[in-house]
């Protein structure tokens, strides 16, 4: 059901690494005609640009890069390399970097009234007034297997235990950082994606979305 007659509907999805937030967000966005943005990709893109250009002043550089960033540019590059993953965990803790990316996401939401944004702090910081909030959780082993399969496509040198360790560390950093930690919003609907296949996950999300649309718009 596309939301053609509806002027505004915004969904926020939060969750730890490889819990399925990106997959769920993309599929739901396609189904309902929403513009999709992955917060994680923004941080990965920032890491990619820093690794590639080695700027002296990282903050000013990132500010400049994100002034001209489009979704087309963001989705054009492979941002899921181990090097970018390691670097992303570090820059995600920097307050000024988070501020720049926060402003980018807020402006994105202002321009795109019908959108879905996924990340770690979307419901709590970026879109606290989103129409519907989801929080994904998943067993670490299941999440690590997903990430391992994803990374394996680009490199045969990837080891499962290393992926699992990196994911555990990243989740710990996300939960414990002072700036915008990963938290479940009080209004968020929790979905355990470790126990669901992709179609079941989308079905569960769709049920909640349809219910919310009916409450807000009466149809």
What are these regions (language model features)?
Residues 5-11, 112-113:
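Pre-Walker A (Motif I) flank of P-loop NTPase domains
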Residues 12-29:
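Glycine-rich phosphate-binding P-loop
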Residues 26, 30, 48, 52, ...:
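Short, well-ordered alpha-helices that flank and scaffold nucleotide-derived cofactor binding pockets
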Residues 32, 124, 128-130:
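Phosphate-binding loop of NTP-binding sites
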Residues 41-114, 121-124, 141-145, 161-178, ...:
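ATP-dependent small-molecule kinase phosphotransfer cores
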Residues 115, 131-135, 188-191:
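Short, well-ordered beta-strand core segments
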């Amino acid at each position: 059901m596309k939301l053609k007659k509806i002027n505004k509907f915004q969904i926020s999805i939060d969750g730890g690494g490889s819990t399925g937030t990106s997959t769920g967000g993309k599929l739901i966005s396609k189904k309902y005609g929403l513009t999709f943005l992955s917060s994680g990709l923004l941080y990965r893109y920032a890491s990619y640009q820093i690794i590639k250009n080695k700027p002296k002043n990282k903050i000013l550089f990132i500010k400049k890069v994100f002034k001209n960033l489009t979704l087309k540019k963001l989705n054009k590059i492979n941002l899921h390399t181990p090097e970018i993953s390691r670097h992303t965990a570090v820059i995600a803790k920097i307050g000024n970097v988070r501020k720049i990316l926060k402003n980018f996401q807020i402006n994105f939401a202002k321009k795109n009234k019908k959108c879905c944004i996924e990340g770690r702090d979307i419901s709590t910081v970026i879109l606290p007034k989103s129409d519907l909030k989801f929080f994904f959780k998943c067993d670490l082993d299941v999440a690590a297997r997903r990430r391992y399969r994803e990374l394996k496509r680009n490199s045969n040198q990837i080891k499962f235990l290393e992926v699992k360790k990196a994911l555990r560390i990243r989740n710990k950093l996300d939960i414990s950082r002072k700036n915008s930690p990963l938290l479940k919003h009080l209004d968020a609907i929790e979905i355990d994606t470790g126990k669901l296949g992709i179609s079941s996950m989308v079905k569960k999300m769709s049920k909640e979305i349809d219910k919310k649309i009916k409450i807000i718009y009466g149809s």
